[in-house]
Swiss-Prot record:
This protein's name: 6,7-dimethyl-8-ribityllumazine synthase
Organism annotation: Leuconostoc mesenteroides subsp. mesenteroides (strain ATCC 8293 / DSM 20343 / BCRC 11652 / CCM 1803 / JCM 6124 / NCDO 523 / NBRC 100496 / NCIMB 8023 / NCTC 12954 / NRRL B-1118 / 37Y)
Family, similarity comment: Belongs to the DMRL synthase family.
Catalytic activity annotation: (2S)-2-hydroxy-3-oxobutyl phosphate + 5-amino-6-(D-ribitylamino)uracil = 6,7-dimethyl-8-(1-D-ribityl)lumazine + phosphate + 2 H2O + H(+)
Positions of 5-amino-6-(D-ribitylamino)uracil binding: 22, 56-58, 80-82, 113
Active site per the UniProt annotation: 88
Gene Ontology biological-process annotations: riboflavin biosynthetic process
Cystine crosslinks: none
Keyword set, alphabetical order: Riboflavin biosynthesis, Transferase
This protein's pathway: Cofactor biosynthesis; riboflavin biosynthesis; riboflavin from 2-hydroxy-3-oxobutyl phosphate and 5-amino-6-(D-ribitylamino)uracil: step 1/2
UniProt binding sites for (2S)-2-hydroxy-3-oxobutyl phosphate: 85-86, 127
Length: 156
């Protein structure tokens, strides 16, 4: 048997978007892209909840709690970490990426990583809706595919 992700029958899905308030001008664009993508694939606006957290490092903690509640079919994580002149950038991106990875492996709720990690503000702007598309929209589609795969493999 071959199992392949499909973007079908998503109408009754409940989605959480966990978003960092830091660099909110970029993150708001990512959220818009994610919302539009989810709605284009049948998710009603009333089934999309946005949970704002102070910064990117708080995303994994809140995503874990949301997954534990088991109210949502999937979780999108969004943020923008832009490199500065200190090593803090590396600490933040490693903490966020590792945290989300651990949570996604330890829960039964699909979670996708949509935290931009860029060297410049311009790169973040390009990836949040300018030249390079909108990564929020892309990860939202990935989430819908994961939800579908999870549903298919329940019967294995």
């Amino acid at each position: 048997m071959i199992y392949k992700a499909k973007l079908i029958d998503q109408t009754n899905k409940k989605i959480a978007i966990v978003a960092s308030k830091f660099n909110d001008l970029i993150v708001k664009q990512l959220i818009s892209g994610a919302q539009e993508s989810l709605e284009m694939h049948g998710i009603d606006e009333s089934n999309i909840d946005i949970i704002w957290v102070p910064g990117a490092l708080e995303i994994p903690m809140v995503a874990k709690r949301i997954a534990q509640v088991q109210k949502y079919d999937g979780i999108v994580t969004l943020g923008a970490v832009i490199k500065g002149d200190t090593d803090h950038y590396d600490l933040v991106i490693n903490g966020v990426a590792n945290g989300i990875s651990q949570i996604s492996l330890s829960t039964d709720v699909p979670i996708v990583f949509g935290v931009l990690t860029t060297d410049t503000l311009e790169q973040a702007q390009q990836r949040s809706g300018a030249k390079s598309g909108n990564k929020g929209a892309e990860v939202a589609l990935s989430l819908l595919e994961l939800i579908n795969i999870f549903e298919q493999i329940k019967s294995i």
